[in-house]
Amino acid sequence: MSIALLTFDIFGTVLDWRRGLRDALGGRLADDAFDRIVDRQGALERQGFRQYASIVAQSLVEELQLSPEDAARIGAAAGSWPLFPDSAAALRALRAIAPCAATTNSDLAHRAPIEAQLGFPLDGWICAEEVGAYKPDPRVWRAAAERMGVAPGPDWWHVSAYSDYDHATARALGLTCVFVERPHSRPGPADLVVKDLRELAARIG
């Protein structure tokens, strides 16, 4: 098994954004409300690039009727939302197998608090703010290829719980797609399906 690069979606795959958002709202977040927020964020991203924190904030104003001030505070703190329990140890193990990089629809400001939670830096970080586009836009993947020095192909594995954002474009580029069965994940065609990142590390380690 040849793996030259592992790239990861962050929000919803490495970071538990539903729990983070629920905690920020004082423990009140129904499943259908979360799904509406995710869908609204996707619609806003398709309208053109703007900082992810502002997209989070607008989706909360529109779907939950939060005040703009409260919504902006929550959006700015998104990088501090908790990791899934398996993420840090699994990513540490996976970095011993191949370079690990983030491809994320988030802001540069989110990198430091996320890596602080991990306890180590990832080998690369390709975020929407740098690229000026959101996944599934192919520009994100081209930026990752240039940054990491790896051409798209089957030895580049992309790991995500959101096939609609990630795997359609990744598969079109010839990447190996790994689907992670997180709560509220969005499945689609994948080359490998795992229940969490711990299982992925065990399967390919």
Regions found by a protein language model. Give the residues of each.
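Asp-based, Mg2+/Mn2+-dependent phosphohydrolase catalytic module
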Residues: 1-6, 18, 88, 92, ...
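Low-complexity, intrinsically disordered/propeptide-like segments
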Residues: 32, 63, 69, 94-97, ...
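N-terminal helical cap/lid subdomain that shapes the substrate entry/recognition surface
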Residues: 3-85
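Structured helix-beta-strand junction loops
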Residues: 40, 96-97, 121
